[in-house]
Amino acid sequence: KASLLVWTTTPWTLVSNTAIAVHPEVEYVAMEVTHEETTEVLVVAQNLMDAVKGEKKILKSFLGKELERITYKRPFDYIEIPDAHFVVLATYVTTEDGTGLVHQAPAFGADDLAVCRSYGLPVVNPIAPDGHFLADVPVVGGVFFKDADKALVKELKASGALYKHQQYEHTYPHCWRCHTALMYYAQPSWYIRTTSIKDALLRENAATDWHPETIKEGRYGDWLNNNIDWALSRNRYWGTPLPIWRCENKHEICVDSLKELGTLAGQELSNLDPHRPFVDDITFACAECSQTMTRVPEVIDCWYDSGAMPFAQWGYPHKEGSVEKFKAS
């Protein structure tokens, strides 16, 4: 029996612990540690073992990749997370500090999300959009996420799962207006599948004569090489409304124009201001189930407006002759 010595700077995310990440090519050790009359076996990155107090005896050394998919007991079982809690591999894990084993909560970090998705792990989020734990979560239900740290550390100590707790100074995002702590928060979004044309984008970039030439393989080329699907939607009030209507049965339709919207709604809408709140008042019957269709609440990323404006102001691509006018040479 051994314990994975895992570190985190965000105890509040431990409620959502889904996996433990190790670097596949880093050397790890299982060592017997005796400290204050207690002996236990700990797993830690070899070049970080000096941070562990007590008499140490290495029992075995191995690469991180040998730990892959080994299961473990999570620190809290407050919420259900099915088919999870095993060791995963991640090249972003470092041995500059910590223990070389990193706690994964995919709802609260881009790296965690990408790694856990690659293993088919679920994204479970026990925190509401207002930053408070859901009321039915034991111990910290209804508590603001950062205020939950102390209570959770206390629970870790009581259960014997806490190895060490200390103050650790590090950067953390805060609201620039009110200085409230912020969180990375995974939520459903609408995407443009830009990855489906990634090869074509790279091919056209290679055939483009850039000035200065360094942009071709530098800033722009690097951006194309690291292209991911574009999260188009934004949860704001101001902006171009996402033109998607949905009914209670999840049927959806993307409306192309005010003319089409007027036809669907049976109204003359040529003079409608196509922004919130006015466009949100337009509803119509679903063609598949007759339920009422309402517009989804999201607006579009303003960069979409910026990119479309030079062409859309001249009626592209709907106005006759506009496609030929903007044909690339």
Residue ranges of each PLM-predicted region?
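Carboxylate/His-rich catalytic cores and anion/metal-binding grooves
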Residues: 28-33, 39-74, 296
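Alpha-helical recognition segments enriched in aromatics with Gly/Pro capping
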Residues: 119-131, 236-238, 255-256, 260-329
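Residue patterns forming the tRNA-binding/recognition surfaces of aminoacyl-tRNA synthetases
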Residues: 1-15, 27, 35-37, 66-69, ...
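Short, ligand-facing micro-motifs at secondary-structure edges
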Residues: 80-88
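Basic, alpha-helical terminal appendages of large translation-related enzymes
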Residues: 35-39, 57-61, 162, 167, ...
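Generic recognition of flexible, low-complexity loop/linker segments
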Residues: 17-18, 58-61, 89-91, 111-113, ...
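Phosphate-backbone binding and catalysis cores of DNA-processing enzymes
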Residues: 20-24
